[in-house]
Amino acid sequence: MKKHSILLATALSCLMSVGTFAQETKKDTVSYWKKATSMGATFNQASFNDSWAATQGSKGSVGLNLFYNTKGEYNKDKVNWVNDLQLQYGLLDNGSGMRKTIDRIFFDSKIGHKISKTWLVYGNVNVQSQFTKGYNYGAGAKDVNGNATDLLVSNLFAPGYITESVGLEWKPNTVFNMTFAPGAVRQTIVADKTINYDANGLAYGVDVKNGKSLRNEVAILQIVANYNKDIAKNVNLKLRYQLFANYQDLAAMDSRLDAKFTAKINKYLSTTFDFIAIYDQDQIARLQTAQNLGVGLLYSF
């Protein structure tokens, strides 16, 4: 775990350095930095299909979702450096106790060097995980009273994903970009070995049964596409798609789509709709989908 902690600390330090650099170089802050932060709380309705791995057995109800997003982008000469941190956590009570609706830790740091008007050579580190335990409700063995118990299926950095990539970025405008990274490397971490594993002893592709906590993968190609645009006054659409093609199993490419629709009602109120679709055979050999609709407070600066 020491190595895992070092990797995470290194990645998060990139974001912290944004603020430090901005404070120490006031002229660059004014001229070259563009920063945006939003935070808030929404009351929401959430639902899942039966395949959603992080909270299997939870159908959905009314709950509360908290979020914090901050992004800093530096542009000077041919250098483009983007740091993006997204934190989300939501709970609901559907009559069977408190359950999660959403739980996400996302950090991305990408630095690029322009080689033409629309193309850059870039390097990137991406970290993704969650905050708390997730369960497959009612799927465990029966207790002394004959009631089915819940299976622990996820936790903080169980799984956790750290991806390093170097490649080409196509950035034709300010609202869309796409990266191409042959040879991207991904580490899957399972820090909690008490989570449930399959008949082969694997949890998220990691051999937990035999005491392993880390799996390394190399992609023949990783593609990431981002779209972020105000499609109407006070209405924003944000999309992120990621494809990771492990060279050892091209028939089982991992795909993830994140979509977020935000409509501001006034300065502090907004409506948000989140949609996530995941296909990753190391999690579950079916398409996972989740959606979250909420109305609540939004503060941006």
Where are these regions (language model features)?
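Repeated loop/turn-to-beta-strand initiation elements of outer-membrane beta-barrel proteins
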Residues: 78-81, 118-121, 175-178, 234-237, ...
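Transmembrane beta-strands of outer-membrane beta-barrel pores
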Residues: 41-47, 76-78, 87-93, 125-133, ...
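Surface-exposed strand-loop-strand hairpins of Gram-negative outer-membrane beta-barrel proteins
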Residues: 45-65, 95-98
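Residue-level signature of outer-membrane beta-barrel architecture
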Residues: 70-74, 113, 125, 170, ...
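Outer-membrane beta-barrel "beta-signal"
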Residues: 289-301
